A protein has these predicted regions:
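Short alpha-helical segments enriched in small residues
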Residues: 2-179
Length: 179
């Protein structure tokens, strides 16, 4: 598997990157929402670590199961056709949460940490798909995570990859963590 192993210093940089992003969203009065599976709400949590985030975070969905994704607007046919761990599902998650909260930005992220998902036999450990929906555009990404020391570090690693993409979209200079 590819990817760096996170440590405490990297965690601080990731948290600081989210403060930058959240500050930018507050300044621009842009709203954001998330539909998170692998990160289980970590991205929304990082956003709300900045004072004033209630002005921009419209809400967030933690959709750990396939059923939860479907209940929140991901078409069942997308999951059945492409699998829950796919760019198509991540894109549908980003669109569904953006639409549900009428937000400017929607983030969808799905994947596995270091184990096979017993409910989805097609899962590959460390495989992550994500999407950022802004206006009528969706930017999606894929990466493989190497083994991390804790569940928190898996979530932070995945959250940082999303932050890098969101930073590019917003034109926010991010401090490099995973490069």
């Amino acid at each position: 598997m590819a990817g760096k192993k996170l440590d405490e210093q990297m965690e601080k940089v990731i948290r600081n990157n989210y403060r930058r992003l959240t500050g930018c969203l507050i300044d621009r009065k842009m709203t954001i929402t998330t539909m998170e599976s692998i990160t289980c709400g970590q991205i929304a949590s990082l956003i709300t670590d900045t004072e004033g985030a209630s002005a921009i975070l419209k809400g967030a969905f933690v959709t750990y199961s396939n059923e939860a994704k479907i209940m929140q607007g991901v078409p069942e046919a997308v999951i059945e056709t492409y699998g829950v761990y796919s760019k198509e599902t991540a894109r549908a998650m980003a669109e569904a949460c953006k639409r549900a909260y009428r937000a400017d930005i929607g983030i969808g992220i799905t994947g596995t940490t270091g184990n096979i998902d017993p409910n989805n036999q097609d899962s590959v450990p460390g495989e992550v798909y994500y999407a950022v929906a802004v206006s009528d555009t969706i930017i999606d990404g894929y990466f493989q995570m190497g083994e991390q020391d804790s569940r928190l570090y898996y979530k932070l690693y995945a959250a940082e990859k999303v932050a890098e993409t969101l930073g590019d979209v917003l034109g926010v200079k991010m401090e490099a963590v995973l490069a």
